[in-house]
């Protein structure tokens, strides 16, 4: 599984424009092969700062999404002024477990928490 962490600051007065574009792209993501989930978070300290956290089956799915024309157009609009700054991180998920799904829980944690 791949995690894409997109941190960005919206330029003054451009927040709503970004959110509208994100909503449109969300429609494209629905049913996109290899897409798992996405969440968007807004900073409590700086209302212009956001983090978008998406999960993908594999890097090939990320590559295909990166090259979807509507996504490329949205990227260009972001770089042209919607974002005052951004940072993108792409990471391999090492473990994925929850309170109830424990298969990938580290042994030492299982010993303590079950």
Positions of PLM-derived features:
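Short S/T/G/P-rich N-terminal loop/turn motif that feeds into the first structured element of a domain
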Residues: 1-50, 57-67, 82-114
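Conserved short loop/helix modules at catalytic or binding sites
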Residues: 74, 78
């Amino acid at each position: 599984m791949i995690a894409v962490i997109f941190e960005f600051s919206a330029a003054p007065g451009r927040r709503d424009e970004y959110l509208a574009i994100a909503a449109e792209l969300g429609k494209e993501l629905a049913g996109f092969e290899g897409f798992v989930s996405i969440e968007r978070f807004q900073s409590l300290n700086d209302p212009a700062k956001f983090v978008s956290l998406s999960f993908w089956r594999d890097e090939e799915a990320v590559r295909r999404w990166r090259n979807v024309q509507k996504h490329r157009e949205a990227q260009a609009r972001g770089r042209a002024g919607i974002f005052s700054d951004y940072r993108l991180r792409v990471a391999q998920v090492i473990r994925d477990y929850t309170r109830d799904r424990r298969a990938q829980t580290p042994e030492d944690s299982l010993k303590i928490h079950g």
